[in-house]
Design a protein with these regions (language model features):
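Alpha-helical repeat scaffolds in large eukaryotic proteins
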Residues: 18-21, 37-46, 67, 71-74, ...
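Amphipathic alpha-helical binding modules
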Residues: 62-98
Length: 98
């Protein structure tokens, strides 16, 4: 089953962040590690990471979509500390991607 933003935004976000972290051609190692850390935090919160492609082959668009997916979560789920920490790490990675 493929991660779907509508049915499981947590897993979709984690999968996108994992894909960005795995992109060794476009993403510098330090930013990749931030994305992998964010994906790991989301897995701790219950996400199931799957291999999915980057959105349009673009790491920046993929991180932005992951953050958008987290915004679809209900308030209680988003307030979970690992989810908040993952959102912060993703935001920091997005900023550094330029």
């Amino acid at each position: 089953m493929t991660a779907d933003v509508a049915s499981d935004p947590l897993s979709y976000a984690a999968s996108l962040l994992d894909a960005v972290g795995a992109d060794r051609e476009q993403v510098p190692a330090d930013i990749a590690l931030e994305c992998l850390y964010a994906a790991e935090l989301l897995e701790l919160a219950g996400a199931r990471t799957e291999r999915i492609p980057l959105i349009g082959g673009d790491p920046r668009a993929s991180v932005r979509a992951a953050i958008g997916a987290l915004g679809l979560m209900d308030e209680a789920a988003f307030a979970n500390p690992p989810v908040l920490d993952a959102a912060r790490a993703a935001r920091h990675a997005l900023r550094r991607l330029g």
